[in-house]
Amino acid sequence: MPTPLALLLSAILIIGTYFAMPFWPFRKSNYDPRGKHCYITGGSSGLGKALAERLVKQGAHVTIVGRDSKKAEGVVEELKAIAAPGQIIQCIAADLTSPIASTNAIHAACKPHADQAPDYVYLCAGFSRPKLFVETTKQELKDGLDGVYWVSAYTAHEACQMMSKQRRTGKIIFVASFLSYVSFAGYSSYSPAKYALRGLSDALRSEMLLHNIDIHIFLPCGISGPGFDAENRTKPAVTKKIEEGDTPITPEVCAAALESGLKKGYYQITDNLVTEPIRLRSNGGVPTNNFLLDTLWLIVSSVGVPIWRMTADSAVRSFRAKVEKELEAKGYYVS
């Protein structure tokens, strides 16, 4: 016989579904890269490169942007080898933490396309250098914001202006992180910028309805590759302990998860079931992905997330003596 709690939850689901039906977000996705100009920041490695390969295979015209011109040119040659005749494959070398360079880069990319704004903009550029906050320099704090937030915000701003001025529909896809939802020891120079990126994306999702421009945000967990290896070189032991058991996925699997979400018309896209309870606890009132599943995940999150948080806090406390000893050896303390 069903328990009173089970009956109550069933009633909530049924009643909630009934009243939500008139506003149900049935999304028929118009995502189709074929023949579209796809502009990818951070496209010379990791997720950006894997995404570029997928898009080229689907018949898209692809522009990748990266700081290292030689590396980007090498990727372009790889992409051209799998492209069909007529596809425009190119690269732009630019430091996208500069507003001027960001503006110049996207306009240069559009020259072969009659100066028309890109159809799809994928903001994959960024980096993570985890450290304990008290050991992070002021410059590293600034670099974290520049290399995670501004590196995408400047390009998004110019893309929105280009699309709206030309009355063109399009898509802008932010690549954020699981750490845009939740943060912990070691990510004080990274998570704030990722939170800001989610805030910008949420605001634009609403505002760009005025211009019929679609905004999406991808929030993956760890992605294997050179970037992840560099991250681990500075990652504190306490951070590694909290992340113990987390296995990064390949850029190729990550890119497939991103496109799967875009094809479903999701606004917030994740690559891991573990992220779903966190997403529902922290989504800021944005559109759901699936009403019934999201309701169930929300119920799970009310138990699972507090348990995870207590476990993480316990791990941090267990490292207190070790961290104090290390800081003492470095002469950090004044007495």
Swiss-Prot record:
It catalyses: sphinganine + NADP(+) = 3-oxosphinganine + NADPH + H(+). GO terms for molecular function: 3-dehydrosphinganine reductase activity; NADPH binding. It is an enzyme of class 1 (oxidoreductase). It is a single-pass membrane protein. It holds the Pfam family adh_short. InterPro entries: KDSR-like, NAD(P)-bd_dom_sf, SDR_fam. Keywords: Endoplasmic reticulum, Lipid metabolism, Membrane, NADP, Nucleotide-binding, Oxidoreductase, Sphingolipid metabolism, Transmembrane, Transmembrane helix. NADP(+) binds at residues 47, 95, 190, 194, 223. The chain crosses the membrane at residues 288-308. The active site is at 190 (proton acceptor), 194 (lowers pka of active site tyr). Its main location: endoplasmic reticulum. A motif (GXSXG) lies at residues 42-46. GO terms for biological process: 3-keto-sphinganine metabolic process; sphingolipid biosynthetic process. Its EC number is 1.1.1.102. Belongs to the short-chain dehydrogenases/reductases (SDR) family. Catalyzes the reduction of 3'-oxosphinganine (3-ketodihydrosphingosine/KDS) to sphinganine (dihydrosphingosine/DHS), the second step of de novo sphingolipid biosynthesis. This is 3-ketodihydrosphingosine reductase TSC10. It comes from Cryptococcus neoformans var. neoformans serotype D (strain B-3501A) (Filobasidiella neoformans). The gene is TSC10.
